């Protein structure tokens, strides 16, 4: 006859509560950084701001959105650069995760932004949102991700996605060096 160790019910309840608090702690915010998808350089007459997505970029967005949802990703707010390629990426991503594209916020400061502008944009996220996604451009989005999580991502590729957990209750408490990097994914990453 086998021996079964008795585990006190209280210990199981505490362990379950601890596991739940890590995932759903109300004093945590989740920040996603999405670099715009691959853009087209076919029309040399277009200004940088107007460049559309390339066909590869259009194909990559649903793949990344599916991976995002497959990991249980949810976003309550999407803020993007007003550049055509960033807006198009945000809209395609939103459609693929059933986020209302009308709720996407265009922020001009995310075009040619630096870390401080990304930080400012994140600090103004609506308090009702526990998660937010910033859609922008390199090199700023990579620099911002590295500054937030004290990590060393060499380059967030086009349509690359970074997920970070922030130990804050209010978005205006966001600061560099305080995030935990949870995920770094991109289209060519083997799954």
Regions found by a protein language model. Name each.
Residues 151-182:
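Domain-level recognition of soluble alpha/beta enzyme cores
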Residues 29-30, 34-108, 151-156, 191:
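Active-site-proximal alpha-helix that buttresses catalytic centers in soluble enzyme cores
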Residues 125-133, 138-160:
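Non-DNA-binding regulatory cores of transcription-related proteins
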Residues 110-124:
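Short phosphate-binding loop-to-helix
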Residues 180-191:
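Charged phosphate-binding loop/patch that engages nucleotide di/tri-phosphates or the phosphate backbone
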């Amino acid at each position: 006859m086998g021996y079964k160790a008795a585990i006190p019910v209280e210990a199981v309840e505490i362990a379950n509560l601890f596991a739940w608090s890590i995932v759903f702690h109300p004093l945590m915010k989740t920040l996603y950084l999405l670099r715009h998808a691959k853009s087209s350089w076919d029309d040399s007459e277009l200004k940088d701001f107007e460049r559309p997505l390339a066909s590869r970029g259009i194909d990559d967005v649903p793949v990344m959105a599916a991976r995002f949802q497959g990991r249980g990703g949810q976003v309550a707010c999407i803020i993007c650069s007003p550049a055509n390629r960033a807006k198009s990426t945000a809209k395609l991503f939103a459609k693929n995760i059933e986020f209302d594209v009308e709720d996407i916020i265009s922020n001009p400061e995310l075009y040619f932004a630096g870390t401080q502008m990304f930080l400012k944009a994140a600090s103004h996220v609506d308090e009702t949102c526990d998660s937010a996604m910033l859609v922008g451009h390199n090199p700023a989005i990579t620099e911002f991700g590295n500054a937030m999580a004290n990590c060393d991502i060499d380059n967030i590729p086009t349509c690359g996605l970074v997920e970070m957990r922030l130990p804050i209750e209010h978005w205006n408490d966001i600061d560099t060096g305080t995030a935990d990097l949870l995920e770094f994914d991109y289209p060519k990453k083997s799954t």
